[in-house]
């Protein structure tokens, strides 16, 4: 490709609404153009990156035995109503009506449609296993779309779905896909981790996220440097303390703490470690009738150490707390006789259900709210001042330095961007939609399913978050819009420069290299700035002075300076750099 034929449109400054590096650089490099909130046009330079991502994904999906298809973007609501997701998904699911008043959705994912396809066609165990995938446009009506392609409303996703006869074969299919994902991300040339994850609303009990490591990542990734253990923050287990609880050494005392409504403030006032304070979190669960009317509400009190944060996913798995909400102020005052900031498990106005974090269950001589404004209670002990807790659970986020659940060291935490996710679904969707097959005995069985997603348009943004500097993007070779750029200096003035550039360009094309020749006639400074911003990994500069010495200049995008290369062997040199 020659630059004069291509569409190159760079900006010196990023738009004001571009908040993160990838959004800023993709806009400045002319890779995307904003059309509306969370909706972008993929410009030629950006589309080349996306197509390379798609090609790698497609090759590895095919290699893993998956078969490509395409499902509709607009889907009849009746399939989503079968699984209950038409109501459950909330406003993120874009619902529309046609001219006849019939309900449709704009797909955010396609479990319902693929399950309908398979229940029509799969009749016998002899037709299994099957694995189908698509690379297709999706839409989620994000409340606050931001960060460019990182959190857009319209995006491209690869979603695959496996179908098996039983759990064992379904989990084997899951492992085949998980290995395919590792090959995909290895080929992208990105630093990533595959981490154990919670399946969330999509269902199932086996799940991994593929996270691109980046300091700006939204997700906390928990791992053990001494082993292969890795999980996201929602999934990572905080083990119980290994030592026995110490005996009580303090009397329980009601202590004045005027205007000290946080554990940190109380600890500072009393001159005690923050980890000896206990925070009280009040939740509620509602029981409803068939019409959705609340007929009974249960109030819950959760106790966590003052230096720990509640993990909402873990809390939601405590028996009875599925679908919890935070209690309202009137509910809190009714049960505790006090506003938040001074709450505790003693002197309640009405009974509540108590759930205690593992760390709090091991505390002695701890501090909590007195259920009275401006007062806390010090020296609280289990068994003496409060009955031993009946319900103890892991309620918190782990912190760096906690023991690893695999017993092979301590945990560390880094940031990541989720770009892929694999799930074993089981029969969640096949049961809801009555998707069955006949086994060897002629008896109907529900299809065992897995689903596997990769954010095709999110991945380039994640790659930029991991690979950039003050000059612009630094693409890995595998997904760069072009692998090599040739920059001739003043080719209109120096025929030998133009000839050398054309010759090398032709040789690289013949060798199958994705090369672009910048024949726009730009000044060297402007030309170099463009390609550093765009992030092409290999740059060859051809100038008249260097040619007279038999040399070209080569610079990798990560290098601070260029190096001299013998013009006669430049092609072989570049082939070596490109591992051709």
From Swiss-Prot:
Localization (cell): Cytoplasm
PROSITE patterns for the chain: AA_TRNA_LIGASE_II (PS50862)
Family, similarity comment: Belongs to the class-II aminoacyl-tRNA synthetase family. ProS type 1 subfamily.
Organism of provenance: Polaromonas sp. (strain JS666 / ATCC BAA-500)
Name the record gives this protein: Proline--tRNA ligase
Domain text: Consists of three domains: the N-terminal catalytic domain, the editing domain and the C-terminal anticodon-binding domain.
GO cellular component terms listed in the entry, alphabetical order: cytosol
GO BP, one annotated term: prolyl-tRNA aminoacylation
Subunit structure: Homodimer.
Function: Catalyzes the attachment of proline to tRNA(Pro) in a two-step reaction: proline is first activated by ATP to form Pro-AMP and then transferred to the acceptor end of tRNA(Pro). As ProRS can inadvertently accommodate and process non-cognate amino acids such as alanine and cysteine, to avoid such errors it has two additional distinct editing activities against alanine. One activity is designated as 'pretransfer' editing and involves the tRNA(Pro)-independent hydrolysis of activated Ala-AMP.
InterPro entries the UniProt entry points to: aa-tRNA-synt_IIb (IPR002314), aa-tRNA-synth_II (IPR006195), aa-tRNA-synth_II/BPL/LPL (IPR045864), Anticodon-bd (IPR004154), Anticodon-bd_dom_sf (IPR036621), Pro-tRNA-ligase_IIa (IPR002316), Pro-tRNA-synth_IIa_bac-type (IPR004500), Pro-tRNA-Synthase_IIa_type1 (IPR023717)
Substrates-to-products reaction catalysed: tRNA(Pro) + L-proline + ATP = L-prolyl-tRNA(Pro) + AMP + diphosphate
NCBIfam families with a match to the protein in the record: PRK09194.1, proS_fam_II
Any one Gene Ontology molecular-function term assigned to this protein's record: proline-tRNA ligase activity
E.C. code: 6.1.1.15
Main location: cytoplasm
The encoding gene: proS
Domain of life: Bacteria
Keyword list, A-Z: Aminoacyl-tRNA synthetase, ATP-binding, Cytoplasm, Ligase, Nucleotide-binding, Protein biosynthesis
């Amino acid at each position: 490709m020659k630059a004069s034929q291509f569409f190159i449109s760079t900006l010196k400054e990023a738009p004001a609404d571009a908040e993160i590096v990838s959004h800023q650089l993709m806009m400045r490099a002319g890779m995307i153009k904003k059309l509306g909130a969370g909706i972008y046009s993929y410009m030629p330079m950006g589309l080349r990156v996306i197509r390379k991502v798609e090609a790698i994904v497609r090759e590895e999906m095919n290699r893993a035995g998956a078969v490509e298809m395409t499902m509709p973007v607009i889907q009849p609501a009746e399939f989503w109503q079968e699984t209950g997701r038409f109501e459950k998904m909330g406003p993120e699911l874009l619902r529309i009506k046609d001219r006849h008043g019939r309900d449709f959705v704009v797909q955010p994912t396609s479990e319902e449609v693929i399950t309908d396809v398979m229940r029509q066609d799969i009749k016998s165990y002899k037709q299994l296993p099957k694995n189908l995938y698509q690379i297709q446009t999706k839409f989620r009506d994000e409340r606050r779309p931001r960060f460019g392609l990182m959190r857009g409303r319209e995006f491209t996703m690869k979603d695959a779905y496996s179908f098996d006869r039983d759990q064992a074969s379904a989990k084997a299919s899951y492992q085949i896909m998980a290995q395919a994902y590792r090959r995909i991300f290895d080929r992208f040339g990105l630093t990533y981790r595959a981490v154990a994850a919670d399946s969330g609303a999509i269902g199932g009990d086996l799940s991994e996220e593929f996270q691109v490591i980046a300091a700006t990542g939204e997700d906390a990734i928990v791992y053990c440097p001494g082993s292969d253990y890795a999980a996201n923050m929602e999934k990572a287990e905080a083990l119980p303390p290994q030592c026995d609880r110490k005996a009580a050494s303090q009397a329980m005392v009601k202590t004045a703490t005027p205007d000290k409504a946080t554990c940190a403030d109380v600890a500072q006032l009393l001159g005690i470690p923050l980890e000896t304070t206990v925070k009280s979190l009040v939740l509620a669960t509602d029981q409803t009738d068939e019409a959705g009317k609340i007929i009974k509400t249960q109030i819950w009190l959760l106790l966590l150490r003052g230096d720990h944060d509640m993990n909402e996913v873990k809390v939601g798995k405590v028996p009875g707390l599925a679908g919890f909400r935070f209690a309202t102020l009137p509910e809190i005052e009714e049960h505790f006789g006090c506003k938040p900031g001074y709450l505790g498990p003693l002197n309640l106005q009405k009974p509540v259900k108590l759930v205690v974090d593992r760390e709090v269950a091991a505390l002695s001589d701890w501090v909590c709210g007195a259920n009275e404004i401006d007062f806390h209670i010090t020296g609280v002990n289990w068994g003496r001042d409060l009955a031993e807790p009946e319900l103890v659970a892991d309620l918190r986020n782990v912190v760096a330095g906690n023991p690893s659940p695999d017993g092979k060291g301590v945990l560390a935490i880094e940031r990541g961007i989720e770009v892929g996710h694999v799930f074993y679904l089981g029969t969640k969707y096949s049961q809801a939609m009555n998707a069955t097959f006949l086994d060897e005995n002629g008896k109907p069985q529900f299809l065992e399913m897995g689903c596997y997603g990769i954010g095709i348009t999110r991945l380039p943004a994640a790659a930029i978050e991991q690979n950039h500097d003050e000059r612009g993007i630094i693409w890995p070779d595998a997904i760069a819009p072009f692998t090599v750029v040739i920059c001739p200096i003043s080719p209109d003035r120096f025929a030998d420069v133009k000839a050398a550039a054309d010759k090398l360009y032709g040789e690289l094309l013949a060798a199958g290299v994705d090369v672009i020749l910048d024949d726009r006639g730009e000044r060297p400074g402007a030309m170099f700035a463009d390609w550093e911003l765009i992030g092409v990994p290999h740059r060859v500069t051809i100038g008249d002075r260097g040619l007279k010495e038999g040399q070209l200049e080569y610079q990798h995008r990560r290098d601070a300076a260029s190096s001299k290369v013998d013009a006669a062997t430049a092609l072989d040199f570049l082939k070596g750099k490109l591992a051709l």
